[in-house]
Amino acid sequence: MKNLILILPLLMLTGCVGDPADALTGPRLSPVGSGLRTQADPIPVTPRMRTPVSYRSTWDDGTDLYRDPRARRTGDVVTVIISMQDKAKLDNKTGRSRDSQIKFGLDWLMDVAGWADKGQTTANLSTNTQIKGNGQIDRTEDIKLSIAAIVTDVLPNGNMMISGSQEFRVNTEMRVLNVGGIVRPRDISRTNTISYEKIAEARVSYGGQGNLSDVQQPGWGHRIYDAVAPF
C-alpha cells in the first residue's frame, strides 16, 4: 500500500511533459520571421523627405502624382482578402494480430541398479496479442473576410513582412482577428489587395473572448487536470 501511494504521484507527474499553459490559453501560433509579438510594438514608418514648397502655388513638389498605390515600403498598408472554403475527411483504421504457440515434450526411461524409472514431461507456451485502432476526422470551414495589414519590414530580396489585427466588440463578446506572413510585391493587385493563399508562412487567427467563449470552454480546474493527468 505504501508503494502504491508513492507511485501515484510519479504517474501524475508524467502528465506534466506538455506545456500546462496551453491548457489555459489554448494553442499558440508559431512566429513568422522575427515573430508575432503579443505586445504591439510601435509601427515602423519610413521618414519622408520634405521638399520646399513654393508659396502661393497649388502644386506640391512632394506629391506622388504617378506613384503606384500598392504597398512597397515599411509602414504602408495592404488589404488581405481571406476567402477559405476547406473540407477534410479522414478515416483511418489499423489492426494488428499475432498468435504464437510453443509445445515441448520429453519422454525418458532410466534403469539404475535394478531401479527403473520412466516418465513424461510436457510444456506448452502460447501467446496472443491483438491491437485495433480507429480514427475519423470530418471538418468543414467557410471563412470570408478582409483585414488591413501593415508592412513591418522589407527583406533584402524585396519581399515584405506584414502583420495586421482587428478587434470587434459586441456587448460583452470580443472577436479578434490576426494575420501575418511574407508577401511578394508582384502578388499585390492594382487595388492594393492580396489574397491569403499568396502569403508565405501565413498565420491567421480568428477567435473570441468574453462570456460566450467562457461558457463554451471547460473550467480552468478541468483544463489543469487534463494537462497533468497521465491517462
From Swiss-Prot:
InterPro entries per record: Flag_Lring (IPR000527)
Main localization (coarse): membrane
Membrane topology according to the record: Lipid-anchor
Alphabetically ordered keywords of this record: Bacterial flagellum, Cell outer membrane, Lipoprotein, Membrane, Palmitate, Signal
Subunit structure: The basal body constitutes a major portion of the flagellar organelle and consists of four rings (L,P,S, and M) mounted on a central rod.
Covalent S-S links between cysteines: none
GO cellular component terms listed in the entry, alphabetical order: bacterial-type flagellum basal body, distal rod, L ring; cell outer membrane
GO MF entries: cytoskeletal motor activity
Protein name as it appears in the record: Flagellar L-ring protein 2
Residues linked to a lipid group, N-palmitoyl cysteine type: C16
HAMAP family reported for this sequence: FlgH
Family matches, as Pfam families: FlgH
Signal peptide span: 1-15
Transcription regulation recorded as keyword: no
Chain positions covered by the region annotation Disordered: 30-54
Lipid-binding residues (covalent, S-diacylglycerol cysteine): C16
Localization in the cell: Cell outer membrane; Bacterial flagellum basal body
Role: Assembles around the rod to form the L-ring and probably protects the motor/basal body from shearing forces during rotation.
Annotated family: Belongs to the FlgH family.
GO biological-process terms attached to the record: bacterial-type flagellum-dependent cell motility
Gene name, Swiss-Prot/TrEMBL: flgH2
